[in-house]
Amino acid sequence: MPKFLDALAGFAVTLGSMFKKPITEGYPEKPGPVAPRYHGRHQLNRYPDGLEKCIGCELCAWACPADAIYVEGADNTADERYSPGERYGRVYQINYLRCIGCGLCIEACPTRALTMTTEYEMADDNRADLIWGKDKLLAPLQEGMQAPPHDMAPGKTDDDYYLGNVTPITPVPSGTEDAR
């Protein structure tokens, strides 16, 4: 007798869903909401003055189980400074044909240079376009940022950058300079 009741319970679920209004998704015209912690595409972040956070340590590439990240570090010079430390990521590539979106690269990054956004539409009809370089991965320059290479903020050390003690560069409007 209990097996018969189990079958009736299954039919009740089916019968109940037959009379519900069908749910139609509006995707791609109207994409649904994305969870705040969703693992979407990667982004290389910048400091408030525009210098890159990536120091070219390659820890993200070592942590990637799919071998989807390639990093080639280089030394900063007095003439060309891209990050506050001694090194920067000269070449940075993520192969989205291999990436499994696990986020281990994010956890491995010591400077929080690499994060994941909530963007998920990265499809392309060309395989070569799914290998993203620094040009696509770097966060866009915000107001008060200067495109690298440039010197560190006056009076600041690389420790100040890592501790978050750097503010955006604010240009002085023309005509407001002191006439001394």
Curated annotation (Swiss-Prot):
Q: List where in the cell it is found.
A: Cell membrane
Q: Origin, by domain of life?
A: Bacteria
User: How does this chain assemble?
Assistant: NDH-1 is composed of 14 different subunits. Subunits NuoA, H, J, K, L, M, N constitute the membrane sector of the complex.
User: According to its UniProt record, which reaction does this protein catalyse?
Assistant: a quinone + NADH + 5 H(+)(in) = a quinol + NAD(+) + 4 H(+)(out)
Give residues annotated as binding [4Fe-4S] cluster 1.
C54, C57, C60, C109
The encoding gene is nuoI
Task: Name the needed cofactors.
Answer: [4Fe-4S] cluster
The EC number on file is 7.1.1.-
InterPro entries for this protein: 4Fe4S_Fe-S-bd, 4Fe4S_Fe_S_CS, NADH_quinone_OxRdtase_chainI
Q: Which GO terms describe its molecular function?
A: 4 iron, 4 sulfur cluster binding; iron ion binding; NADH:ubiquinone reductase (non-electrogenic) activity; quinone binding
The membrane topology term of the UniProt record is: Peripheral membrane protein
Job of this protein: NDH-1 shuttles electrons from NADH, via FMN and iron-sulfur (Fe-S) centers, to quinones in the respiratory chain. The immediate electron acceptor for the enzyme in this species is believed to be menaquinone. Couples the redox reaction to proton translocation (for every two electrons transferred, four hydrogen ions are translocated across the cytoplasmic membrane), and thus conserves the redox energy in a proton gradient.
Which cysteines does the record link by disulfide bonds? none
- The residues covered by the 4Fe-4S ferredoxin-type domain are 44-74, 90-119
Residue numbers spanned by region Disordered: 145-180
This protein is called NADH-quinone oxidoreductase subunit I
